[in-house]
Amino acid sequence: MDLEEQKKAVIEKLIREGYIKSKRVIDALLKVPREEFLPEHLKEYAYVDTPLEIGYGQTISAIHMVGMMCELLDLKPGMKVLEIGTGCGYHAAVTAEIVGEDGLVVSIERIPELAEKAERTLRKLGYDNVIVIVGDGTLGYEPLAPYDRIYTTAAGPKIPEPLIRQLKDGGKLLMPVGRYLQRLVLAEKRGDEIIIKDCGPVAFVPLVGKEGFQG
């Protein structure tokens, strides 16, 4: 099977297994070429549903995890989304496909080399609705706040206060919490109240920063 056939096969499998359901998420995963975000020696593994090393101690998330996170966040066209942990840019591209031209993805990456490479790939593929910023993602990005949705691609000890502040009322935040025994947590902001839902066990790299783990 060529890469396109492998992509269709893995997405059909994820639909059968219940990880992805909505047309928006399915279409986005079909559209984004995961291989473009990988180092040359890993391109042939682009549609193996597993995390892959991308350098600097970081990974690209498994395809099912990206799809599941998009479903849990209930992303919609026109939304402004904050992503903490750009990595190679794949997750940002999938999010950008869903929010569309009228939406915006603001992605923060603490490792300059990864940010630069991700931005190059995103530009090459035409994702002009993604802004990549080098910085401490645990502090969010105040200049473009508030956000409809926020998610992190790394696990922190708790949800950082700056991210809660930068979330719109009615907005949703999704992040893995914990160091070794991690849980994926969905938080919804309702006025001064934060409603927390546990979405199950996960395994992510640590979220490093002032409001995260110390690097």
Swiss-Prot record:
Q: Which family does it belong to?
A: Belongs to the methyltransferase superfamily. L-isoaspartyl/D-aspartyl protein methyltransferase family.
Q: Which Gene3D superfamilies does the protein's record reference?
A: Vaccinia Virus protein VP39
- Give a short account of what the protein does: Catalyzes the methyl esterification of L-isoaspartyl residues in peptides and proteins that result from spontaneous decomposition of normal L-aspartyl and L-asparaginyl residues. It plays a role in the repair and/or degradation of damaged proteins.
A GO CC annotation given for this chain: cytoplasm
Biological process terms in GO annotation: methylation; protein modification process; protein repair
Its chief place of residence is: cytoplasm
Q: What is this protein called?
A: Protein-L-isoaspartate O-methyltransferase
Where is it localised? Cytoplasm
| Residues at the catalytic site | S61
What EC number(s) does the entry state?
Answer: 2.1.1.77
Q: Name one GO molecular function term.
A: protein-L-isoaspartate (D-aspartate) O-methyltransferase activity
Q: Which UniProt keywords apply?
A: Cytoplasm, Methyltransferase, S-adenosyl-L-methionine, Transferase
Q: Which reaction does it catalyse?
A: [protein]-L-isoaspartate + S-adenosyl-L-methionine = [protein]-L-isoaspartate alpha-methyl ester + S-adenosyl-L-homocysteine
Q: Which organism is it from?
A: Methanocaldococcus jannaschii (strain ATCC 43067 / DSM 2661 / JAL-1 / JCM 10045 / NBRC 100440)
Q: Which InterPro entries match?
A: PCMT (IPR000682), SAM-dependent_MTases_sf (IPR029063)
